[in-house]
Amino acid sequence: MNLCSSSGATASNTSLSSTGHPESNGSGPSEATHCFGGGGGGGGNNAGGGSGTDTAPNSNKGTLNGGGSGGGGGANPASSNGHSLTHNNENNGNMPPETRPKMVTVKHPESNKPKPTTKKIVKNIQADQDVIKALQRCRDEGIKRLDLSKSSITVLPNTVRECVHLTELYLYSNKIGQLPTEIGCLVNLRNLALNENSLTSLPESLKHCTQLKVLDLRHNKLAEIPSVIYRLRSLTTLYLRFNRITTVADDLRQLVNLTMLSLRENKIKELGSAIGALVNLTTLDVSHNHLEHLPEDIGNCVNLSALDLQHNELLDIPDSIGNLKSLVRLGLRYNRLNCVPVSLKNCKSMDEFNVEGNGITQLPDGMLASLSALTSITLSRNQFTSYPTGGPAQFTNVYSINLEHNRIDKIPYGIFSRAKGLTKLNMKENMLTALPLDVGTWVNMVELNLATNALQKLPDDIMNLQNLEILILSNNMLKKIPNTIGNLRKLRILDLEENRIEVLPHEIGLLHELQRLILQTNQITMLPRSVGHLSNLTHLSVSENNLQFLPEEIGSLESLENLYINQNPGLEKLPFELALCQNLKYLNIDKCPLGTIPPEIQAGGPSLVLQWLKMHSPYRQM
């Protein structure tokens, strides 16, 4: 018996939108993209800072939309041909009330109480009818692109076999547990999107789809790669992210046309030598698995430009990695590496080097200097005790360096002398006691994070960093801030939390672009009156200090939204001028002995406190 019978509809270049009106063919599926980077591991469909993503080409126009936007849930009692409960309901809307049938009820065995059929079931019945109609139109009009995504489909009707002209079929975000054998009749299919379903296997008949190029199986329940996939030798893009796959068979070597393979977020412990046969791969994502080693054969994938290995359990990287001279991005974040191979020097196209979250103590001599295309270097959360060897040459084209959470006790003098484009430096959580004497030459620095070190002094030369917008010095041992801080006219964020500062310089008032000033947990007894010039300040935190009073000029902070002055045991009153801060949304005055303001007013929040200050102010114009 031939399962692939067809009505013989003439092929058409027309595709239908969700409204059923003819449209010209769209441009086809969007190109697959792949990125990963620093910051977070993890997870979700995008890496930044460093987590990886894969984006499948989903149809969004020029298609016949079958099931609308979904809705419904649970099992659909209607069969795939639209019968069962449908005959009781489908024409009720056109019947007069007196002749209209009663609502269908379902009596459960465990209960004698009749229960009305839920709206979900009715919606699912309608969804099934819509899908059947969409398949019929697809057959009759020779439609090539069909979008049945988000249609609450649990069973794909076997009439799909009649849609022989289909080249693109989108079934993502449904509830499909198994595909019908008839899917193999779609011999012209090139793109098949099955992501976000409940598939545990694929039918062997899929092998007849010999023109299939893009197969998306993300977010299903596959415990292994279905064997039929290895017979789809025309595949160029294969997404298997977020399944339950534990092994990769040697048959993978048959997919020689693959350019993109995503196995991200599975349970794979070993990647066999078969990976080396995929010489056309440009993107390989095996992040978020349980790999401890990579095969030497990975070096045969010489066309790789993106290799994402982050969030595994890698103990080493094979020397053959140096063969990947087209490599631009290499994700090694959060593994168990103690070192990286010298051969990485050969990967001269890499523009980002990120080994965050490993146990690396040093890099091969001069490795970073050899990677002259690097623009971003992230070595955070390792065991470095000093800067990598290689001198100033290793940072020539770099704009961002992150060495957070290591054991580095100094920044070498002149190390950034050739880093003319360096704008971001993160040295948080190290063991720095001082900054190098040439800190004043870092004139292009925009963001400088020196938090959680042991700095005792900020050099006067800080005044030369006039492009600085973010300066974070929290949790150090600073006793004072130099007057030259006033030269940093572009500063937007100044964080001095948890130091030993007693007095702020008057020049702080020159920072007219300042938006956040964080001074909590110091020994400050008073704020300079010049603070009133900070017209763009939205956040001011002076909690846990020794404030005796707030200057009247605080009333000039028209942009202020958040004010933290809690836990100042000597602060007994607030200036009436504070009532002029009309944009104040949050005011924390806990554990301040404000005897002049009644407790019930204090408990009422910022607006009530401001109202009280205004009412009791000697300035009637307020």
From Swiss-Prot:
Its keywords, alphabetically, are: Leucine-rich repeat, Repeat
Ranges of Gly residues composition bias in the record:
36-52, 64-75
Record region (Disordered):
1-117
Q: Which InterPro entries match?
A: Leu-rich_rpt (IPR001611), Leu-rich_rpt_typical-subtyp (IPR003591), LRR_dom_sf (IPR032675), LRR_domain-containing (IPR050216), LRR_R13L4/SHOC2-like (IPR055414)
**Bridged cysteine pairs (disulfide):** none
Biased composition of type Polar residues is found at 1-30, 85-94
Question: What exactly does this protein do?
Answer: Acts as a Ras effector and participates in MAPK pathway activation. Probably acts as a regulatory subunit of protein phosphatase that specifically dephosphorylates Raf kinase and stimulate Raf activity at specialized signaling complexes upon Ras activation.
Which Gene3D superfamilies does the annotation name? Ribonuclease Inhibitor
SMART domains linked: LRR_BAC, LRR_SD22, LRR_TYP
In which family does this protein belong, per the annotation?
Answer: Belongs to the SHOC2 family.
Top-level lineage group? Eukaryota
According to UniProt, the name of this protein is Leucine-rich repeat protein soc-2 homolog
Sorted alphabetically, which SUPFAM superfamilies does this protein's record hold?
A: L domain-like
Pfam families, A to Z: LRR_1 (PF00560), LRR_14 (PF23598), LRR_8 (PF13855)
One GO cellular-component annotation of the UniProt record comes to: cytoplasm
- Record PROSITE patterns: LRR
Q: Where are the LRR repeats?
A: 142-163, 165-186, 188-209, 211-232, 234-255, 257-278, 280-301, 303-324, 326-348, 349-370, 373-394, 397-418, 421-442, 444-465, 467-488, 490-511, 513-534, 536-557, 559-581, 583-604
